[in-house]
Each structure stands twice: as C-alpha cells, then as structure tokens.
Regions:
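Histidine-acidic metal/acid-base catalytic patches
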Residues: 2-10, 24-223
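Acidic/histidine-rich, metal-coordinating catalytic segments
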Residues: 14
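Surface-exposed cleft-lining segments at the edges of enzyme active sites
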Residues: 17-24
Length: 223
C-alpha cells in the first residue's frame, strides 16, 4: 500500500490499545505506530486519536515526542470519560485540550507550514449532530487561540529555574483568557459569521432537513 501512494499522498496510521482486534493486535500504542511509520518511510505518519488511551495517559507528552521525531501527522479529536466515548472534544477536560494544543504550537505543529491535520472523530448520539460538530470546532479554535497566548519566554525561564508555580501561572493566565471576542472579530474579517452556532440556528437548515428526511428522525446507532 505504501509503495502505491501517489505523489501528493501519505499514509496516516492510528493506534488503539483495545477493541477492535485489528487495533489492539496490530497497532496497540503510539510507539508501535511510530515504529511502523519509520520502517515505511517519510510519507508515513502517526494519527493520534485523543480517545485511544488508558485513563491518566499523558497525551501531551506523546504529542511532544511525535513532533520532536517528525512523525505526528494528524489528530482525531474527541473527549472520553470511560473508554473511546467519542464525545465532543474539550467537553470532558478542556484543560487537557489546551495542554495538547500548546504542545502542538510549541513543537511547530501549528501554522501554514505544518502538515499536522486536525480532524474530528466523534459520535453525537444525544445532541444534534451539526451543532455538535460546530461546538467541537469552536472548542478547538478557542483552545488553540489560548495556546497561542502563552508567554513562552516566561514559561521557559520558569522551567529552567525550577519554578513550578511560576510556570503554572504562565499557563493558567493564557488558559483563563476569554478569546471568544477576538475569534468573533477574526471570523467577521474573513466574511464569516461572528457566532457560527447562532448563524446555523437562524439559517433554518435544521428544520428544512428534518422536513425532507424520510421518517423525520436522524440516523443513529439504531438505523
């Protein structure tokens, strides 16, 4: 498969330490995925699904290592409480999402020159699917903006001095900053709605697709 990649294609290999069997028996962890990608070549990279880890896993450490090694290719963003729940990204632990995105920024994985792809891998079984996707994108945008606000020089000084509380204060200052107004201005400057959720609700699209949908109910696990 790798040998048959086109000139503008790459192979992105995800991992998971439990079900289904083709994950757990072949690519159970990020190290195995990394080893496969190194063996394949430069166009093979690791995909990190934020829900594919044991409770308590230091995901931001994995992000940092894969960026350092030049093998982080993509994210499948979601949240989890118990297993691979595929909940809205940032819903379970927004501070973890902030820490992950800060490592992405610090490690050079964010920006026009980066090949790291941001994707969503979620199941919206209770909330409506499109608003759930909009909320997910907004969460990633907001935490990325906060990660970009971290005073990296001050953080580096605190880290080198062994000042744990000082380093924490630098991160928390950025994390607690309300960036929603700035993001609204950023969207307006690009001809986009300042409030994407409000724009979707006002569009009437949800009501229209319900009226057109066979049976009147969206498809789900019971479909």
């Amino acid at each position: 498969m790798y040998r048959r990649l086109g000139a503008h294609q790459r192979l992105v290999l995800e991992y998971k330490f439990f079900e289904p069997a083709f994950y757990a028996t072949d690519v159970p962890d990020w190290g195995t995925s990394y080893a496969h990608c190194v063996a394949l070549g430069d166009r093979a990279v690791v995909c990190l699904d934020t829900g594919h880890h044991a409770p308590g896993t230091n995901i931001e450490f994995i992000v940092m290592q894969l960026l350092r090694l030049g093998k982080l290719g993509a994210f499948d963003f979601n949240s989890r409480f118990y297993a691979d729940d595929d909940l809205i990204v940032g819903a379970a632990d927004p501070f973890q999402l902030f820490r992950i995105l800060f490592e992405v920024v610090r490690g050079g994985g964010y920006g026009p020159d980066s090949d790291v792809t941001f994707m969503l891998d979620q199941c919206h079984n209770i909330e409506a699917k499109i608003p759930g996707q909009i909320r997910s994108v907004l969460n990633v945008q907001e935490m990325t903006a906060r990660a970009l606000l971290v005073d990296r020089a001050a953080l580096t000084d605190a880290e080198r001095a062994g000042d744990v509380l000082g380093a924490n204060a630098v991160l928390m200052d950025a994390f607690y900053t309300d960036v929603r107004g700035d993001l609204a201005d950023w969207r307006v400057a690009r001809g986009l709605p300042a409030d994407p959720m409000a724009a979707y609700r006002a569009s009437g699209y949800a009501e229209r697709i319900v009226a057109e949908r066979i049976g009147g109910a969206q498809a789900g696990w019971g479909a």
